[in-house]
Swiss-Prot record:
Domain of life: Eukaryota
Residues spanned by motif Involved in PIP2 interaction: 81-97
Family assignment from sequence similarity: Belongs to the profilin family.
Further details from the record: The variability of the residues taking part of IgE-binding epitopes might be responsible of the difference in cross-reactivity among olive pollen cultivars, and between distantly related pollen species, leading to a variable range of allergy reactions among atopic patients.
GO CC term (a single one): cytoskeleton
Organism taxonomic ancestry: Eukaryota, Viridiplantae, Streptophyta, Embryophyta, Tracheophyta
Maturation and modification: Phosphorylated by MAP kinases.
InterPro entries to which the protein is assigned, alphabetical: PFN (IPR048278), PFN_euk (IPR005455), PFN_sf (IPR036140), Profilin_CS (IPR027310)
Cysteine disulfide partners in this protein: 13-115
Cited Pfam families: Profilin
UniProt KW Membrane keyword: no
Protein name: Profilin-10
């Protein structure tokens, strides 16, 4: 299966009548492996900050997490594995695997829990595959 198929079939899938606003699979350096049509372009310093938060959980909490200049308030995640952010009625979940970052961005009516479930399910699968 191609990386684009993972995005199209596993991240942008319908959950209870809703789907993510955008999604992507990135390398740890921010290189886009696959993305949905409306996925925002990360800046290099944003990827650096995200990777630092995985290495040093809590790094982004004081300043917030920036994604394509949009600021997300960092909310509870899983140290070293998952970062979650909230911005207005939407938010973001980022799951780190051995080689990739699985990213899902949502808006209402999708819920934070639905976003996390979709992103983390694919991320956990990739971890089991050694990716």
């Amino acid at each position: 299966m191609s990386w684009q198929a993972y995005v199209d079939e596993h991240l942008m899938c319908e959950i209870e009548g809703h789907h993510l606003a955008s999604a992507a699979i990135l390398g740890h350096d921010g290189t886009v492996w696959a993305q949905s049509a409306d996925f925002p372009q990360f800046k290099p310093e944003e990827i650096t900050g995200i990777m630092k938060d995985f290495d040093e959980p809590g790094h982004l909490a004081p300043t917030g997490m920036f994604v394509a200049t949009a600021k997300y308030m960092v909310i509870q995640g899983e140290p070293g594995a998952v970062i979650r952010g909230k911005k207005g009625a939407g938010g973001i979940t980022i799951k780190k695997t051995g080689q990739a970052l699985v990213v899902g961005i949502y808006d209402e009516p999708m819920t934070p829990g639905q976003c996390s479930m979709v992103v983390e399910r694919l991320g956990d699968y990739l971890v089991k595959q050694g990716l």
